[in-house]
């Protein structure tokens, strides 16, 4: 018999908000009696944008900006219906992107 598993991937630009959200999910799942693996930190994506400082000249003078996307992975092993219901009711910040795979 195959074990049922829910995999949750969290993404956010702010790692403090991401860690708080992951902690909320882990506490909620443990309260309902399911096993949790994680949160596992995944590699951070770093996007770098280079633009010219001046609108007309000085190609040598440039400025760089970056956006870091932090990611976490949480596995819920053998979830109960109570676990799924508690996760549906969980209120997480708007800055955290959540992907759930069954």
UniProtKB/Swiss-Prot annotation:
Gene Ontology biological process: translation
A Gene Ontology term for the protein's cellular component: ribonucleoprotein complex
Recorded GO MF terms: structural constituent of ribosome; tRNA binding
Record-linked Gene3D superfamilies: Ribosomal protein S10 domain
UniProt keyword Transcription regulation, yes or no: no
Keywords: Ribonucleoprotein, Ribosomal protein
Assembly with partners or alone: Part of the 30S ribosomal subunit.
Protein task: Involved in the binding of tRNA to the ribosomes.
Family assignment from sequence similarity: Belongs to the universal ribosomal protein uS10 family.
PANTHER family cross-referenced by the UniProt entry: 30S RIBOSOMAL PROTEIN S10 FAMILY MEMBER
Protein name, entry field: Small ribosomal subunit protein uS10
